[in-house]
Amino acid sequence: MKKLLSATLLGAALLAGTAQAQDETVRLAVDIPYEPMEYRLPSGELTGFDIELGNALCAEIGIDCEWVVQGWDGIIPGLLSRKYDAIMSSMTINDQRRQQVLFSDPYFTPPSAWFVPASSDIRTPAKETLEGKSIGVQRGTLQDNYATDMYGDVANVKRYSTAGDMVLDMESDRLDIVFLDFPVGKSTLLDSEEGNYKVVGGMITEPKKYFGDGFGIAFRQRDEDLAQQFNDALATLKENGTYDEIFEKYFGNKKQ
């Protein structure tokens, strides 16, 4: 009886140890490339603002990050089917997504912007100006929703898997204008080697129905404890200056 009890206790301890070891690694899903937020270096290493901030958050919590590359179209279904534990991939917090996932506190709030070739005669993204034009957006993003609702009846809204694919079509004159998160458009268009692009119109953050409340980390709705650990770690990184260091590396000025 004692041997049986000891074996049972040993088995339980081993199972507990296995569960604890699994809990020490959090799998974070990311869709690449979306420079400067998430992309690969020539070496194949993942980097970007989300990647570095995510690694810093995991270090603060005391766990390891395992990054899982996942296409945007399937990124929420993959979370719900437990392919990974959370999504940290420039995902905008909005009411529609809140019905499916639990968001962390916002960690970044970028504006959106319209980008055209420097030689373009488009001066404003007014609806009448874009009538008959081809608009590029990344499929399934807030920019996709906004452009479809606001311009879909007068313009050809073309959807792409990545921002890089949009750039290729822009360079080949298959697009007249693209609508992106400003940091991504700045990195892929304004700061590119060609650099023959410009922004038309101002920075866009409204209406909240489309542009939400900033970027958040998405969790399964029942994973409140895990979300709180990331919220606490984010607050600590903002207090101790780590967040500002990462922000300045990618965006060049201190987050206010």
Positions of predicted regions on the chain:
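Ligand-binding clefts/hinges and TM-proximal coupling segments of bilobed small-molecule sensing domains
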Residues: 64, 142-158, 197-199, 229-256
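Extended ligand-binding regions for polar small-molecule ligands
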Residues: 52-60, 120, 133-134, 139-141, ...
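Sec/Tat signal peptide C-region and signal peptidase I cleavage site
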Residues: 15-21
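Extracytoplasmic small-molecule ligand-binding "clamshell" domains
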Residues: 22-90, 99, 240
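Periplasmic-binding protein-like
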Residues: 32, 109-116, 193-231, 251-256
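Short helices/loops that flank or line small-molecule/ion binding pockets
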Residues: 56-60, 68-69, 73-85, 100-102, ...
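A ligand-binding cleft/hinge motif common to bilobed small-molecule-binding domains
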Residues: 74-77, 89-99, 146-149, 176-211
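Bilobed "Venus flytrap"/periplasmic-binding protein-like clamshell domains
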Residues: 32-35, 46-59, 113-163, 182-184
